[in-house]
Design a protein with these regions (language model features):
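Bacterial N-terminal signal peptides that target proteins for export
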Residues: 1-11
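C-terminal motif of bacterial Sec signal peptides marking the signal peptidase cleavage site
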Residues: 19-22
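N-terminal export/membrane-targeting signals
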Residues: 13-16
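N-terminal amphipathic/basic membrane-interacting segments and domains
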Residues: 24-397
Length: 397
């Protein structure tokens, strides 16, 4: 083989190898991103289970987050020539090509703690976050059983509280029955969760408004001039508190919407108000009151206590409640076993036991949705993990 032909073959092979390296880079990057994403998600999920186990043993909860992931990929190619093992010695050279891919990840983890996170962990959720999850298609039965700590009902002017706690038998059963009633209305696609929309109006003398003041008013209000009275009438649309109903609240007169908003406004922001009226689906059992939401820390304690100390039990619906789809005994069925369950894809070991979510049987989907909801609520609680100024551990491979 002549030297020119050898060089030509070498150049062709080198070109092919460089193209091959370029083709390998995107798949390698994709696999790495997906692998890190799965690892971080799995880490958070297991921490949630681990903290339920800690709360089960009345120990403090704690979370650790990944603050930074940096990975460097090194793609290398090399080429050379070597004499062949056969043929006339010294006359034939064999081109040699090679390549390698190296990954050098650096992962920084830091504790999620401090006053700000602790305050968010202990602060009850507001109605806006509850409504956001409900509007994403969340089951109101699951949402309220996990997020609400009590039901408050107006009984002839008296505010009566029913706790979402199995130790309070009368309160727990009333809470479950009302939640089931709302769930039945939702299953029939007759449940509304809307803000009270209305207008506020003001009247001011025209001579009290300067040209600059008029321009400022136009930015925030709808302005109409009354030449006879020489006044300006200001109107401003208001989106008030959220109300769960079995009717369309926009069909109510404005005065009624204002009254409902003002009633809800007297309650704290972690109250979710509801109004079930006769004459509409589910109106056979008229109800009016609020659900008081709890904090993420209280949710973990509720799930932990339901394992052994305060187990939930079956509650049947009220006779006035329409048909519904699901009524699981437990908000989330947690298994505590001596050995690791083979059928579970999410298990942690703590205090000599294996904690897992029951994903077998007819309620497998319910339990998965319950854990997914817990994960989403944690994401709503935690702030961005700090990347500086806190003790951290950096792992370099």
């Amino acid at each position: 083989m002549t030297i020119p032909s050898l060089l030509l073959r070498g150049l062709i092979g080198l070109t092919v190898l460089m193209n091959l390296a370029g083709c390998l880079s995107p798949p390698t990057l994709t696999r790495a991103v997906v692998s890190y994403d799965n690892a971080i998600t799995d880490s958070i999920s297991k921490q949630l289970l681990l903290n339920i186990a800690r709360a089960h043993h009345h120990q403090p909860v704690h979370f650790t987050g990944v603050s930074n992931v940096a990975a460097t990929f090194d793609f290398r190619i090399n080429a050379g020539a070597t004499p062949t093992l056969t043929g006339e010695a010294g006359k034939t050279l064999l081109p040699v090509f090679g390549g390698s891919v190296a990954e050098n990840p650096t992962i920084s983890i830091a504790p999620i703690d401090g006053e700000e996170f602790t305050r968010r962990l202990l602060t009850p959720f507001q109605e806006t976050k509850f409504t956001l999850l409900l509007r994403q298609g969340g089951d109101i039965d699951l949402l309220l059983r996990l997020m609400a700590k009590e039901l408050r009902v107006d009984d002839q002017g008296e505010d009566i509280a029913y706790r979402n706690s199995p130790t309070d038998k009368a309160g727990y059963e009333m809470f479950r029955k009302v939640v089931l009633h709302l769930s039945a209305i939702q299953d029939a696609n007759r449940l509304y969760a809307e803000s009270m929309l209305f207008e506020r109006t003001w009247t001011i003398p025209a001579e009290s408004v300067t040209a600059e003041g008029f321009k400022a008013l136009e930015q925030d209000y709808l302005v109409a001039y009354d030449p006879q009275q020489k006044t300006y009438r200001l109107r401003k649309p208001v989106s008030g508190r959220i109300l769960i109903t079995n009717y369309d609240p926009n069909t109510l007169p404005q005065e009624e919407r204002v009254r409902l908003h003002e009633e809800a406004e007297r309650s704290p922001m972690n109250d979710v108000s509801f109004d079930i009226r006769p004459g509409h689906y589910g109106g056979e059992w008229p109800l009016k009151g609020e659900f008081r939401l709890r904090s993420f820390n209280t949710m973990l304690n509720f799930l932990a206590q339901s394992v052994e100390e305060e187990p939930e039990y079956a509650v049947e619906k009220d006779n006035r409640t329409p048909p519904f789809m699901d009524n699981p005994v437990k908000t989330m069925d947690l298994l505590v076993q001596e050995s690791s369950p083979s059928e579970s894809d999410l298990t942690v070991q703590s205090h000599g036991k294996y904690y897992s979510v029951n994903i077998t049987g007819p309620l497998a989907r319910w339990n998965r949705e319950a854990f997914k909801l817990l994960y989403q609520l944690f994401q709503m609680t935690v702030t961005e993990v700090s990347r500086s100024g806190v003790p951290s551990i950096t792992i370099a491979k």
